[in-house]
Amino acid sequence: VHISSSVSFDPEVVGATAARLLRFIRVEHTIFTLPMAYAAALLAGGRMDLWRAVFIGLAVFGLRTAGMSWNNIADYHIDKLNPRTQGRMLVAGKVSFKEAYGVFALGAAVFILSAAALGWWPLILAGPYLLVVVTYPYAKRLHCMPHLHLGLVYALVPLGAAIAMHPEDIETALAKTPWLLVLASALWVAGFDVIYSKGDYEFDRAHGLGSAAACFGIKVADAVAFLFLAASATLYVVNHLVYGLGAAGLLATLAGAALEVYSAILGTRGEVARAFNLNLAVGLLIPLGIFTGLYI
């Protein structure tokens, strides 16, 4: 008797599906988030072993995966109407809703399990963390500064990494958290999001969606973005000095801060693509300054 299975394993199909879903969650953004997480963890002190390093990385990956997939699900009907976002994978039919919900569930599960592996307080805070992340897409429906909500989402990464270094004692964890780095990171992301949202100025105004540009005008949005990014750059430098991270690392920190301010100038000129590329460099230079200061 010959028994055949209707289900076959095709490595090429599996690989193509994995690659497609990784594009859907923009995995490269997660990779650029990790250095800041590890920088915050090391500044918080405690014992960084392989176990902790791996699960901090997995927690970041899981949280961003859940957030990115839910953002696409929640914004589906808006993205269908916006010419700028009509090519997004869920809207374009390259990813199904079933897949999107599956990716969200997987990301949330990876995040919660990683938090549990890191300790008691990371697990307790996993629920509130997810709540902050999944409510972000609705912020622009409610008020004019969803950029601050996105900044908070990003700030959860260095904050969570710091708490993971002292997972059984929340008072010690909060006392050891590099708050200047956390605040600088929040302002960095919020400031750039103000710049990025200018591209949707007319669409947001027509559909009653909130952003600094839509509510207050382009000039005010430019001023807000520059203020946020300049403040962030200043805080990154002050953080370096407060922790006494030394001259060698200070060069990288100053370079990152300078690029951040320059990206703000480019953004106010409408050169968003160039500003975005500079921001990728900022996300590497600031942690590099910290790593160099700690170990060289």
Give names to the regions the model predicted.
Residues 1-296:
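Multi-pass alpha-helical membrane architecture of UbiA-family
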